[in-house]
Amino acid sequence: MGDLTLRCMNCRSLLDIDSSLVDLSMAQRDLLLNSETNTDNSDNNKHNGENDRNIIPQEKLKIINQVKSPSQLRIGQAKNVTAESYVFLTDTEFSLTKFKNNGDEFVDDEDYDERNKTLSSRISALSNIFNILSCKSNIDYPVCQGCCDTLLEKLKEEYNQELKKRDTYHEFMKRIQEQNNSVEIYSDGNKGPKELKNLKREKEELLRQLQELEGENDLLQNDIQTLQSQLKEKQEQQLEQLREKNVQQMEHLSFIKDIQSLKNQRVVTLNHIDSLRKLNIYNETFRISHKGPFGTINELRLGSVPKIQVPWTEINAALGQVVLLLSLIVEKTSLPLPDYNLKPMGSTSVIEKRDLQTDQWFVLKAYGGSEFSLSSLFHKENPIDKALLAILEIIKKLSENVSSNTSEPASIELPYDISDDKINGLSILLKSSSPSLEWTTACKFLLTNIKWLLAFSTSRINKAKP
């Protein structure tokens, strides 16, 4: 039978049809067509027998019984007619084959098996059987052995699920029936007065307990509200305390910062005071130094040489600074200087000298110039020479007075010796000539002695301070 071309309706694989299916008799065909419907009806009758009739009302059972079975429905008639149109029958075969009234069964003559010998008629008859079976179930026939096993497993699983649903439905109906029975029992009006009295007493007791619980609930709600208000108030107090604490800490930090700033300022001020204490104000005010061949006081050159001409205005200003410094030393040291009176007036400073014989005061000009003078022509001297001699005498007397008032006389010795009009052997007199290198060098030595005298005088002034 390998020439048959039927395929599995599920996996579309070729089927090897057994010869017993090809040579089916009419009785065998009727058995195949009616077996599924009868099986379904018998199963439904078995499962839905006594239990359903005990639970389902009679009115619903009548409606269920009036429903037609699948075998009574005309399903697949049009399909069978369509399939039949492809079968070629002989005159004898046409007279033997016809449909019954319900469309689900075939009429077969006794001689059908003997006359139906053609392969096409057999295939057509078998296809009609498969079509009818497919219409009566949810399975498309034919199927192979593998697909058949799969379908059996699936149907078995669905069957078990339906059984579970049925059991659940029965259990639910049973519970409903029990509830209805219990309601009928409790609703029975033949209860005794004692039981009703007990129920009434129990009801009153439950109501009383309910009222007590509601009262306790109200008390608890009030307590909860009170505690919540107290908690909120306490939290606000804590927040306020934290704010105050933060403010205090900020003020404390600011106070510490201010104190530290004041301490730092104090340290800076003390350091500045120490530096000022160590500072010699006289040395800073009168800076005596040298610049080449010239001695300088506050950057003013005292002297002049032929190669470097210094104007008399600068020389006079330097002499004015010398007179101012000597007057300051006399004032701060309180050293006696009865024969001289220093008058610092800048570039026109003068020195007053008392004549011991006549007891008269003479004014000596501590400034000069390049103008022509008759006295310098006849006396061969310059008016500034007397002021320079007076400055030498004042320096010598001040050094002697400082030495007489100190316990270390050797420490007051001047670096350049002063004798009459000479200092370190160089004459301080300018005479009628113009400034020279010798006179400039003598002025330089003069400033050096004044610087030493200033240092000793400053030491004495500092010791005299309280």
Swiss-Prot record:
Membrane topology: Peripheral membrane protein
UniProt keyword Iron-sulfur present: no
Observed phenotype of the null mutant: Still forms preautophagosomal structures (PAS) in proximity to the vacuolar membrane.
Record region (Required for membrane-association, autophagic function during starvation and normal autophagosome morphology): 439-464
Region described as BARA: 279-463
Disulphides: none
Subunit structure: Component of the autophagy-specific VPS34 PI3-kinase complex I; and of the VPS34 PI3-kinase complex II.
Family the entry assigns: Belongs to the beclin family.
Name of the protein this chain belongs to: Vacuolar protein sorting-associated protein 30
